[in-house]
């Protein structure tokens, strides 16, 4: 009675309580004070408070004898006011506990969540027991709320918040592209090596087939070529969109663009080829001017054994005046070659004389003999002379017998002969003011022998003359090919840069812009 009198005396308070109790759940969540510095999630706090409020409502439903879906009595409202006051007190205490328990682990939170779930299960039992007294709409809404809360508690109890950065799709795509490119390169190398190994047997087999059965081989080759051409054509037309083939104008424009592009490609190739050829020609001319070729002469010697000391001549420019020995008049040929210098001045001459002698008893008994080389001028005068003694290499009789035993088969068959080759190196001559026109090689006679004796027996002889270049000229001559490549490439790059800077339209065609900017609406080149 007192509560009824109070509600009648204070109608505004009763209306406020009605609005407060009839408000949805979100209203209670928004009214609850939540501290921002709490380490616990806000969803956990909201579930705890909603579960506590549901416990109060379920205990109310058990104590009341009857319920109506239309509303509540004044006594029920006063009891809910008391429960609401208790709820606010619990909220304040929970905030205080929350601010003081920052060091508590998540395990305690999970235990509390399990308690909340069990309490929510009790709510479901209470609602099921009083199903005859509760409105169907209210029952459905209550069960839905509890089930959703249980699902939220289970989700939170089984999951831990993880902070992961989203993967960068661009980096992953680039990495995948690089990996695929490496795999394709390896596949190409393996297939290429396999083709190199299988191609020779395949070619040999086809050659044998063509030799034994040419007509079937020709038919097989024709089918193979037709299959390859068909595969290439299918690949080309597969890349083309078949719907574009229906538009004749668009196809003609594509063909025209392709032809125009091929024309400009051929034109640019011709220009670049011309620049390359010109650079190669200029590089060759420069190398020919700066690189001096050393003088080289190789001649076979024919000694004149009619003389007491056999002699032979090797012409450098001419040996026309060697018979005069400075006593005969100058001929027209001598006057022509007098001012001709073949070997550059102040260059050394390296002479190598090779003689092949038989291992005869005469040569072994002869022992030492001497070779002389005279440098003659145009009129036959001797400019300089070089002498070198030589002899056969000595081998004792036991060594000779052992070598003959091991070489008996080649000696009998004629693959090996009993000969020795002597190589004499004659150095020390430097070209002076008077140019050298001829060389005279003389085998000098031994002093203790009578005339015509004391001369070795020869199979053949040859002479090699080479002039020595200075140090830097020698380096240029040895590296002339490398210098030619570097000079030609440098000239080509220089010509290309000059053409791009000064004659740009000759090598790069002028193209029209596809998109016209607002500042240049007419598309006119500036």
UniProtKB/Swiss-Prot annotation:
Q: What is this protein called?
A: Seipin-2
Q: Which GO terms describe its biological process?
A: lipid droplet formation; lipid droplet organization; lipid metabolic process; pollen germination; regulation of double fertilization forming a zygote and endosperm; seed dormancy process
Stated family: Belongs to the seipin family.
**Residues annotated as transmembrane:** 195-215, 224-243, 258-278, 483-503
Where is there biased composition of kind Low complexity?
A: 58-70
Q: Where is this region: Disordered?
A: 33-77
Q: Which InterPro entries match?
A: Seipin
Q: Does the keyword Endoplasmic reticulum apply?
A: yes
* Organism of this sequence: Arabidopsis thaliana (Mouse-ear cress)
Q: Which UniProt keywords apply?
A: Endoplasmic reticulum, Lipid metabolism, Membrane, Transmembrane, Transmembrane helix
Q: Which GO cellular component terms are attached?
A: endoplasmic reticulum; endoplasmic reticulum membrane
Where does it mainly reside?
Answer: endoplasmic reticulum
Whether DNA damage counts among this entry's keywords is no
Membrane-topology descriptor:
Multi-pass membrane protein
CDD domains according to UniProt: Seipin_BSCL2_like
Question: Hey, what tissues is this thing expressed in?
Answer: Expressed in seeds, seedlings, leaves, stems and roots. Not detected in flowers.
The cellular location(s) given in this protein's UniProt record come to: Endoplasmic reticulum membrane
